[in-house]
Amino acid sequence: MKKNKLSIKTIVAIGIGSAVFMILGRFGSLPTGIPNTNIETAYAFLALMALLYGPLAGFLIGFIGHALKDIVFFGSPWISWVFASGIVGLIIGFGARFIKINQGVFKLKQIFMFNLIQIIANGVAWFLVAPTLDILIYSEPANKVYLQGVIGGISNMVTVGVLGTILIANYAKTRIQKGSLRKEY
């Protein structure tokens, strides 16, 4: 019999992470002046959860959290952007193999790697996936959705780069580094 890949801990993290993402997405965002495009603090939290629980959990937290936010606060999900949020969590989650914050290490090398990964994740999601799906699914005008994608992507890169780095660095400080304890005589 094949072992289930999602532990109970990961499933609980997906549920709680989705709820926190939804709340941060609604109450922790600032308008940019571009219609339906905000500066979102939720993506800093998504980055932490994706690094802790991996790509599948990162995808599901971003996807479910964004879908819940849209349904609860706006009436229906905007599926192209919901999917893009999942893509951000997925790509950052793959970075967990390079950035092991559970080992208590988040120094300059890991900070650089994290920011490189999150810039790629946000670029793919907001410059490519979200606007392209907007055009394919909703027949939105290309100039509008690519402008929204660029503004949203850049603001998410900056938000995750600043808040995400601070959040992850502080989390890593709570973990004990391997070999850091010495026996006293």
Swiss-Prot record:
Keywords recorded for this protein, A-Z: Cell membrane, Membrane, Transmembrane, Transmembrane helix
User: What Gene Ontology terms describe where this protein resides (cellular component)?
Assistant: plasma membrane
Similarity comment: Belongs to the UPF0397 family.
Membrane-spanning segments: 11-31, 44-64, 71-91, 111-131, 149-169
Q: How does it sit in the membrane?
A: Multi-pass membrane protein
Q: Which PANTHER family match?
A: UPF0397 PROTEIN BC_2624-RELATED, UPF0397 PROTEIN SPR0429
From the Swiss-Prot or TrEMBL record, give the protein name.
Answer: UPF0397 protein CPE1584
Pfam families annotated for this entry?
A: ECF-ribofla_trS (PF07155)
Q: What InterPro entries is this protein classified in? A: ECF_substrate-spec-like (IPR009825), UPF0397 (IPR022914)
Question: Which NCBIfam families does the UniProt record give?
Answer: PRK13661.1 (NF010182)
List the cysteine pairs that form cystine. Answer: none
The taxonomic lineage of its organism, from the top, reads: Bacteria, Bacillati, Bacillota, Clostridia, Eubacteriales
Its main subcellular localisation, reduced to a broad class, is membrane
> What subcellular locations does the record give?
Cell membrane
